[in-house]
């Protein structure tokens, strides 16, 4: 083909362990992918850090590979999606980070968030949609300001910049000309008022964070600046946190549309439209904003362990040699033989939020084989997804009729069929599974007029396979009731027998 006549969008997907760059054409086909891993640093127990320079280098290597077969002049837009919450502070003049990036998994700031939880829980939840937790950026910023020499003084003089990874990459790509983020990433800092769409002064004062270090918050699709890094000026016109980008990439543009991403853990997001519904057991977050001072919201449920349970079955039990062996093994038995597996290795996330829960396999008899356990592991992913979706439907007052899926385990036909069966709704798997990158490519393309409407994007998006429920209501109820009983037995276990949380 004559690629010179083609227009391309470059999506930078900066994850927790690797930086990726994916090149899309104007029909949203993947043209090329570059991926480079970078290390995580663990200076002390509970500390998880990245070197921002290593992220930048890996990202640029990934870009180089992704665009190796085309002329960079054909790239009409760049979009950036990122691991959310991870925090970088850097010197405004030199651009040099003042400390390593503190990663979303880092728990060092628990004392700060315990204090917030005890004294300001309702205020923070009402304003930000989030619960006080080390996961979010706010306490990480405070820790760097309080613990790294001279940083607070420099911040108060306006000499320090803060950003989540999207902001840091945009700053680097534009040679320091743009210090911006989008609504979706801002909503994960625990400093952004999701009702007023502005940085919240009350929370900033509480944590003694100067507002001058924060980026300007813009819609998820507009030109933020121009990158010179590829040899010619290319507009950076899309920005969204990874899970929100995946929701957009699944063309979940309407209220009640929902997606599940199955990775090491799973993230389920439901589009709830223009009003930030308050939730007891889930997070309320900004999905995206396509216009200034207007946002679409989502309910989010995070499940800590899904794909990681397959890794444990492979590496911990050595029951299989490679992860792909679990599906044929699980398919070799007709059902789970009464076995349930609750993967509470690090407690349970949404909707239980029990840090004291521990993993459990129950229902074992003399006839149980490793195939039954394999099946129970796969089924646990589907049960946990139903747990979250039931709460979403109840709290949003929305009944859903289909679930869009992506991520590694979504390739597993047995699991996807069981997911449809246990939910009693259709499960839809898209042709392009790189929904995070595709979502931000869509946002970037919209930002420069490559596509002109959401309808146009919906028409480009293609289905790979639909899984239709075939299980009887009676069987569905019985299986799910067994799961709920198993979860009850797993909850609070570390409190009963002791052991570290």
Curated annotation (Swiss-Prot):
What are the GO cellular component annotations? cytosol
GO MF: ATP binding; glycerol kinase activity
Q: In which pathway is this protein known to take part?
A: Polyol metabolism; glycerol degradation via glycerol kinase pathway; sn-glycerol 3-phosphate from glycerol: step 1/1
- Where, by residue number, does sn-glycerol 3-phosphate bind? 16, 84-85, 135, 242
Q: Which domain of life is it from?
A: Archaea
A Pfam family that the UniProt record links to this protein:
FGGY_C
EC id: 2.7.1.30
- Family annotation (InterPro entries): ATPase_NBD, Carb_kinase_FGGY, Carb_kinase_FGGY_CS, FGGY_C, FGGY_N, Glycerol_kin
- UniProt keyword annotation of Kinase present: yes
Q: Name one GO biological process term.
A: glycerol-3-phosphate metabolic process
Keywords of the record, alphabetical order, are:
ATP-binding, Glycerol metabolism, Kinase, Nucleotide-binding, Transferase
Q: In which residues is glycerol bound? A: 84-85, 135, 242-243
EC primary class: transferase
Family recorded in the similarity comment: Belongs to the FGGY kinase family.
Q: What is this protein called?
A: Glycerol kinase
Q: Which organism is it from?
A: Saccharolobus islandicus (strain M.14.25 / Kamchatka #1)
């Amino acid at each position: 083909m004559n690629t010179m006549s083609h227009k391309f969008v470059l999506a930078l997907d900066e994850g927790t362990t690797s930086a990726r760059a994916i090149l899309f054409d104007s029909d949203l086909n993947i043209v090329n992918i570059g991926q480079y891993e970078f290390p995580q640093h663990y200076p002390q127990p509970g500390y998880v850090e990245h070197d921002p320079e290593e992220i930048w280098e890996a990202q640029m290597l990934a870009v180089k590979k992704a665009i190796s077969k085309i002329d960079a002049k054909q790239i009409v837009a760049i979009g950036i999606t990122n691991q959310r919450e991870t925090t970088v502070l850097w010197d405004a003049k030199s651009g040099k980070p003042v400390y390593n990036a503190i990663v979303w998994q880092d728990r060092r700031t628990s004392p700060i968030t315990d204090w917030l939880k005890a004294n300001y829980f309702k205020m923070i939840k009402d304003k930000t949609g989030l619960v006080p937790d080390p996961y979010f950026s706010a306490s990480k910023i405070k820790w760097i300001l309080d613990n790294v020499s001279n940083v607070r003084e420099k911040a108060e003089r306006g000499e320090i910049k803060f950003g989540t990874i999207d902001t840091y990459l945009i700053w680097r790509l534009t040679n320091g000309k743009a210090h911006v983020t989008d609504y979706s990433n801002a909503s994960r800092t625990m400093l952004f008022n999701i009702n007023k769409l502005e940085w919240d002064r009350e929370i900033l004062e509480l944590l003694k964070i100067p507002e001058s270090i924060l980026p300007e918050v813009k819609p998820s699709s507009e030109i933020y600046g121009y990158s010179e890094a590829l040899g010619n000026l290319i507009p950076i016109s899309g920005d969204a946190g990874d899970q929100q980008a995946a929701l957009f990439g699944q063309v979940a543009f309407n209220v009640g549309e929902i997606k599940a991403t199955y990775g090491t853990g799973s993230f389920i997001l439901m589009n709830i439209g223009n009003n930030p519904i308050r939730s007891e057991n889930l997070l309320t977050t900004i999905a995206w904003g396509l216009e200034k001072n207007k946002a679409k919201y989502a309910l989010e449920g995070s499940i800590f362990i899904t794909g990681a349970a397959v890794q444990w079955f492979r590496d911990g039990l050595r029951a299989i040699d490679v992860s792909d062996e679990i599906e044929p093994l699980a398919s070799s038995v007709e059902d789970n033989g009464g076995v349930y597996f609750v993967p509470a290795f690090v407690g349970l996330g949404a909707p239980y939020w029990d840090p004291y829960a521990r993993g459990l396999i129950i229902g074992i008899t003399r006839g149980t084989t490793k195939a039954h356990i394999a099946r129970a592991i796969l089924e646990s992913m589907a049960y946990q997804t139903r747990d979250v979706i039931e709460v979403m439907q109840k709290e949003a007052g929305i009944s859903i009729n289909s679930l869009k899926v992506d991520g590694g385990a979504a390739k597993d036909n047995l699991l996807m069929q069981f997911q449809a069966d246990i939910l009693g709704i259709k499960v839809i798997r898209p042709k392009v599974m790189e929904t995070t990158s595709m979502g931000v490519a869509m946002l970037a393309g919209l930002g420069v007029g490559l596509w002109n409407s959401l309808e146009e994007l919906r028409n480009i998006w293609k289905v790979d396979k639909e899984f239709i429920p075939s299980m009887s209501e009676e069987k569905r109820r019985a299986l799910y009731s067994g799961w709920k009983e198993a979860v009850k037995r797993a909850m609070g276990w570390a409190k009963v027998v002791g052991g570290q949380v």
